[in-house]
């Protein structure tokens, strides 16, 4: 099934559940043998806030521009939707992930509540 998917966007907890591996990085790397993956950084203990793209045998870290963010409900869904939208606009997976990371960071900084404001 994974071979027919272009990109999956799990967080650290989801990688552990999908692979049974407590080493999130290794679990994501193992998944990348079957499909492209962006490991979201919000729940990571090894690289908090860093999203890592495993794509065609390479790894790209998207570092957060801000260390102070406010958690939001649905931020993972916003990220995957933003990536899909950027791909639909003709951007590569790498560019789509980077643009989407920056978009989501704006939402995470938008206010102190769990609801995002689009800025």
Give the positions of each predicted feature.
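Hydrophobic residues in alpha-helical segments
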Residues: 19, 87-88, 108
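Conserved phosphate/ATP/ADP-binding segment of small-molecule kinases
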Residues: 1-59
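Phosphate-handling active-site elements
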Residues: 59-60, 86-100
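Internal alpha/beta core interface subdomains
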Residues: 32, 77-81, 98
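A short, charged helix-loop
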Residues: 58-66
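Glycine-rich beta-alpha junction loops
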Residues: 14, 41-44, 65-68, 100-104
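Charged C-terminal helix
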Residues: 94-119
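Short, small-residue alpha-helix embedded
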Residues: 69-93
């Amino acid at each position: 099934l994974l071979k027919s998917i272009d990109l999956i966007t799990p967080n650290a907890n989801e990688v552990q559940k999908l692979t049974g591996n407590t080493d999130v990085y290794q679990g994501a790397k193992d998944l990348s043998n079957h499909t492209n993956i962006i490991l979201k950084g919000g729940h990571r203990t090894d690289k908090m806030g860093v999203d890592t793209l495993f794509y065609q045998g390479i790894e790209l870290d998207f570092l957060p521009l801000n260390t102070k963010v406010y958690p939001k409900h649905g931020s993972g869904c916003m990220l995957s939707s933003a990536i899909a939208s950027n791909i639909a606009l003709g951007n590569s997976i790498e560019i789509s992930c980077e643009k989407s990371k920056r978009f989501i960071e704006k939402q995470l900084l938008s206010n102190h509540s769990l609801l995002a404001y689009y800025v």
